[in-house]
Design a protein with these regions (language model features):
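Structured alpha/beta or helical-core interaction and ligand-binding surfaces enriched in interleaved
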Residues: 1-127
Length: 127
């Protein structure tokens, strides 16, 4: 699957530094755009809201967070609020991290997303 060379959108100036890499990767995916993100600030878990209208992208993202193929610390949930009519999802850490553990887990997640979006998996994921 083709990942764009650069993100489709510019992140807001107040984006948490720890969120920039994962948001940029998600924004490079087809039919996908981040909406909000937060690194947690020691009060809650790291999370990113994103819109996606491509089932193949969602399937690969699901594989990237699947505990069989990752550290198992991440999940993707459907955002079922009234704010968005459809296609909004919530990528979040399952628990809070100290800063160094969070950075390590986010880096592993980013690497894992890029791994599963490699062209070698196109036949496995295209609908």
């Amino acid at each position: 699957m083709k990942i764009l060379d650069k993100p489709k959108i510019q992140l807001p100036a107040d984006t948490d530094e720890e969120c920039i890499e994962i948001c940029n990767i998600l924004n490079k995916l087809p039919n996908t755009e981040t909406c909000e993100s937060c690194q947690g600030h020691g009060k809650h878990t790291f999370w990113v809201f994103f819109k996606c209208t491509d089932i193949d992208v969602l399937t690969r993202l699901g594989r990237a967070v699947d505990r069989r193929y990752s550290d198992g610390n991440w999940e993707i949930l459907v955002d079922d609020t009234d704010r968005e009519p459809r296609g909004r999802f919530w990528l979040r850490a399952k628990h809070q991290y100290d800063v160094s553990a969070m950075e390590e887990s986010v880096k592993e997640l980013c690497d894992n997303i890029l791994y599963w979006f490699d062209d070698k998996f196109d036949e496995d994921f295209n609908s």
